[in-house]
């Protein structure tokens, strides 16, 4: 009985610890403004000396009220990310945000955020959005999709492949996203697979995608852009 009584709280502690490690570490003081010039290398950034912190460490004139240029993007979108690299006061706070502009028929291509869940709301226009589950025991990857209108909200679970697409032929769309990490990261699937440096062997990709090497070589020869700013 004693061993049983010991096992349950131990298991619960292990479970809680596992969940805690799955997210950005919680702050242990009021704030920890990132010192990006420090030679110290840690997971995140060391803290700026508190006596040197000022109000501008928590402020950014981001101009998120203004439309962003989508004309230079093959995807027809522009992601303006506000993370700890742009706003040092976000360090240890476990949050960031982005404005996403979509040209007519533009998209934010299938991608993942390895370190963050994303919640998105539409400010203008209409978006067709979705995410795909991880590999399931039955071999399926289930797709969840929804058409969002102005004011609607949608959540993309951490690490899952997701996308947004503006179905309109003549109207742009705008969304604002919040992410549960100071530095969520983004892996655009096509870019990573076909635009890596050095390139992945076409033998590997031809077999993985069940196409011939010519198709792989053609894809690898394309210019794979980054629509995140």
Curated annotation (Swiss-Prot):
Keywords: Apoplast, Disulfide bond, Glycoprotein, Manganese, Metal-binding, Secreted, Signal. Belongs to the germin family. Transmembrane segments: none annotated. This is Germin-like protein 12-1. It is found in: Secreted, Extracellular space, Apoplast. One of its GO terms (cellular component) is apoplast. Residues 1-22 form the signal peptide. Pfam families: Cupin_1. May play a role in plant defense. Probably has no oxalate oxidase activity even if the active site is conserved. Residues 62-217 form the Cupin type-1 domain. SUPFAM superfamilies: RmlC-like cupins (SSF51182). GO terms for molecular function: manganese ion binding. Glycans are attached at residue 78. Disulfide bonds join 32-47. Mn(2+) binds at residues 111, 113, 118, 162. Oligomer (believed to be a pentamer but probably hexamer). Its main location: secreted.
């Amino acid at each position: 009985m004693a061993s049983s009584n010991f096992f349950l709280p131990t298991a619960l502690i292990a479970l809680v610890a596992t969940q805690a490690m799955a997210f950005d570490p919680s702050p242990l003081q009021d704030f920890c403004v990132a010192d990006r010039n420090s030679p110290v290398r840690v997971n995140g950034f060391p803290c700026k000396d508190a006596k040197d912190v000022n109000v501008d460490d928590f402020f950014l004139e981001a101009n998120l009220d203004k439309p962003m240029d989508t004309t230079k993007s093959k995807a027809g979108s522009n992601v303006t990310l506000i993370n700890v690299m742009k706003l040092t006061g976000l360090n240890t706070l476990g949050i960031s945000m982005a404005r996403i502009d979509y040209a007519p028929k533009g998209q934010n291509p299938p991608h993942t955020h390895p370190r963050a869940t994303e919640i998105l709301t539409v400010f203008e226009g209409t978006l067709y959005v979705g995410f795909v589950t991880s590999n399931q025991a039955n071999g399926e990857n289930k797709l969840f999709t929804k058409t969002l209108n102005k004011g609607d909200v949608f959540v993309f679970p951490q690490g899952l492949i997701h996308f947004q697409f503006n179905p309109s032929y003549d109207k742009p769309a705008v969304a604002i996203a919040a992410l549960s990490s100071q530095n969520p990261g983004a892996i655009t699937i096509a870019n990573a697979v076909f635009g890596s440096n050095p390139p992945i062997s076409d033998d590997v990709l031809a077999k993985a995608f069940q196409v011939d090497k010519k198709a792989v070589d053609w894809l690898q020869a394309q210019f794979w852009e980054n629509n995140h700013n």
